[in-house]
Amino acid sequence: MVQKQQASAGPGTEPKKRRRVGFSPADTGVEANECIKIYLVSSKEEVDSSDISSVKPVDLNDFFDGDGKIYGYQGLKINVWINSISLHSYADITYQSTINGDKGITDLKSALQNIFAETIVDTKDEFLQTFSTQRDFIRNMVSNGEVMHAGATDGSSKNAEVVPSDPQVIRMEIGSPNAGLLYSRLVPLVLLFVDGSNPIDVTDPDWHLYLLIQKKEEKEDPLYRIVGFTAIYKFYRYPDRLRMRLSQILVLPSFQGKGLGSYLMEVVNNVAITENVYDLTVEEPSEKFQHIRTCIDINRLRSFDPIKPDIDSAVQTLTKGKLSKKAQIPRFTPPLNAIEKVRESLKINKKQFLKCWEILIYLALDPIDKYMEDYTSVITNHVRTDILGKDIETPKKQVVDVPSSFEPEASFVVFKSVNGEEANTNVQVDENKPDQEQQLKQLVEERIREIKLVAEKVSKSGQTLKV
């Protein structure tokens, strides 16, 4: 290698200074979950109050690109205040210093606007003013809505009034005046508190909002605020029916555990019945909501007389002998006419009813400990069927080639196997079968745990579901 020579410095010459190469300092960043806190407040006095606790949203890291971290700040703290009256928000951002490290500096304003959109205001003073200037926002927005009840709808479609004593549900078509604007302010709550949810299409008239409204009497005019809501889509089912699909449901964190979620679901169930839709479905329910929904449906089914003989028949069969010792275990699924009766009368869809059916049988077994082994065998059979995606007990068609001098490529016979077992002696055993059996066992244990939790809750007489 040829090196470039440098002229030697004379005795009276100062040595040349070396250029320093600058490197950006390493910045490990901070997770959004660690530095952002969310507060729901209903008055300006609650802002910055030590008596107000933060609420836990979904994973905030998901709102920040890449690894979910915020870069370029030391000692970063972000307190986001949400006005539960007007649904405006304000972010109080503090930090010790900024560091323009190897990851740059996160644009906090842009990141927060991706969540809160037009609801976020720039200054604290502007935010505090919304408690007075936007005091009647909810009241004005829902004035043309339809008041719904758990027992029946009153049919009114204008000038909806809320009874002060109890929260009530007001329905609004998304295409109606004010509904789109109102939902746009609800979107941040959807993103923050409904896991995996996306905003609905406000241009699609088949969407309906069911708003859980609380009316609070004050010295001035009554104060209206939203404590929960659900978004439901109606779609066509051939030849002449509609189905209802519940897509989003939320009770604000500070109002959870008071039975409001159960009341909202009771209203929705009643709407499905009174409007005679085909059935009510739920889009990708969370584990928590599925538990609530199942508890509600179990109570409805326990008082539904047409299926009681079917439950008794299934229980009698299960208690006759040691099912766990039998080669073929009956499915213990409800008869088709029971499924149809439940769908037509209660609007519970087949998939949900099958889950409830297992719990109804569990509740009817007395004493449960005596029959738990056989019951577990039934649940194992159900779980295995769910995994396979088909009924393992249904006779399967098999094709077997047979010798023929007429047309060898087209010579075969078709027959149904006995008890759903394939008559093939060359069955290959999956090398991972022990792992599959262990996974099956874990799934069964999880299903049994869910069944017991629901059964315990609904068995407590006189207890109102606090969800």
From Swiss-Prot:
Checking Pfam families in the record gives:
Acetyltransf_1, Hat1_N
Coiled-coil parts of chain: none
Q: Which GO terms describe its cellular component?
A: chromosome, telomeric region; cytoplasm; nucleus
Where in this protein does the record put region Disordered?
Answer: 1-24
Q: A Gene Ontology MF term for this entry?
A: histone H4 acetyltransferase activity
Positions annotated to bind acetyl-CoA: I249, L250, V251, Q256, G257, K258, G259, L260, G261, S262
Enzyme Commission number, as recorded: 2.3.1.48
Per the UniProt record, the site (Interaction with histone H4 N-terminus) maps to W207
Give the record's keywords alphabetically: Acyltransferase, Cytoplasm, Nucleus, Transferase
**What is the uppermost EC class here?**
transferase
Q: Which CDD domains match?
A: NAT_SF (cd04301)
Q: From the Swiss-Prot or TrEMBL record, state where the protein is found.
A: Nucleus; Cytoplasm
Q: Where is the active site?
A: E283
Gene Ontology biological-process annotations: subtelomeric heterochromatin formation
Reaction(s) catalysed by this chain, per the record, are:
L-lysyl-[protein] + acetyl-CoA = N(6)-acetyl-L-lysyl-[protein] + CoA + H(+)
* SS bonds (residue pairs): none
Similarity comment text for this entry? Belongs to the HAT1 family.
Described by its record, this protein's role is as follows:
Acetylates soluble but not nucleosomal H4. Acetylates 'Lys-12' of histone H4.
Protein name in the entry: Histone acetyltransferase type B catalytic subunit
Q: Give the species.
A: Arabidopsis thaliana
